[in-house]
Amino acid sequence: MTQSTFGIEEEYFLTDLTSRQVARRNVEAFATACQYELGERVTREMFAAQFEVVTPVLHSLTDARQCLEGARRALARLAREFDCGVLAAGTHPLGQWRRVRATDMPRYRAIFDDYRMVASRSVLAGLHVHVGVAEGVDRIRLMNRLTPWLPLLLGLSASSPFWNGRPSGLMSYRQAVCDEWPRMGIPDHFADEAEYQRYVQVMTDTGCIRSAANLWWNIRPSLRYPTLELRIADACPRLDDALCLAGLFRAMVEHVQLTPHHAWCDDPLTRVLTLENRWRAKRQGLRGLFIEPASQRLLTFATWLEEVLERIAIQVPASDRWILEHARNLALHGGSAEAQLAEYRGARANGLEHGEALHQVVDSLMAQTELHPSQQLA
């Protein structure tokens, strides 16, 4: 099988360097500068100070690294011209949703009109990965097989332990906010793409949704491209984490295209167990115990991850084998959410006030996002 093409979308918060809050000043000027220098590679999101980088179709993680490194550095340089920085994380540690301005575009006005406070509270940033699916392959049947693994990808990416300027008690509070929306979270089960299309037809014919683009599940078939789109992952401050997740999801998609379908994937119990595992990943990140959905054994995150890595490793090209060890290291040493909380607690233990400690966390996240050398993993 030819290696699948893929694409990555990363979301960032423009951050005021004085207040460390989500920026309110110079946002439109920054957007204009981005448009001039980066063109269609950067798009506006629901909130004025939120931006997304969209890669072209990619063939390797090397290409992805080059593309995203260039984009992150360009955004950081442009942001400094307006006394701002850029920050990638599932939530902004100092983000106050009541203070964040919406983007004044027809598409987003319609969303805010439909979903009201649910939309207004969703000051969130995600990592989305599209992976191409071979022609003639039923994407829904693939989605059914991939869905039980989604909690692993959430745990690896979790980077949103803070909400509204305080620790939330969750490793991915972003997913907690997502649960306020309809048609988010773990997708409903459909037997195949034909059944899924019937559902979309009913929902659009009755005016419940404008199009399949209003199905925001943690994984979904793309409306515009012949891809499956991963949506569960929090935005990653460290580029290596984002690339690792993209490579793992690509390998997972290739694996399920090449191996036989298993009946347990269609068992209603599997979806219920996946919901439980998603909660555990949202709450505990890489810690705690998870229910392996096929055998229903209770496993540590690291043990479950290792079992999945052993299955998909053959799909990872030699140049990308580093992602396997990187994922293991995250499971062993912790990801972004744990690092943010450790930095916050350390700052408080050293005598900093609550707000000052959060400033320190924001500074670290900006340094990681902007690829400052001292913040990159060896």
UniProtKB/Swiss-Prot annotation:
Keyword annotations of the record: ATP-binding, Ligase, Nucleotide-binding
Keyword ATP-binding: yes
UniProt enzyme class: ligase
One GO process term, biological-process aspect: modified amino acid biosynthetic process
GO molecular function list: ATP binding; glutamate-cysteine ligase activity
UniProt xrefs under InterPro entries: GCL_type2/YbdK_subfam, GCS2, Gln_synth/guanido_kin_cat_dom, YbdK
Catalytic activity: L-cysteine + L-glutamate + ATP = gamma-L-glutamyl-L-cysteine + ADP + phosphate + H(+)
This enzyme's EC code(s): 6.3.2.2
One Pfam family cited in the UniProt record for this chain: GCS2
Segment forming the signal sequence: none
Protein purpose: ATP-dependent carboxylate-amine ligase which exhibits weak glutamate--cysteine ligase activity.
Family: Belongs to the glutamate--cysteine ligase type 2 family. YbdK subfamily.
Stated name of the protein: Putative glutamate--cysteine ligase 2
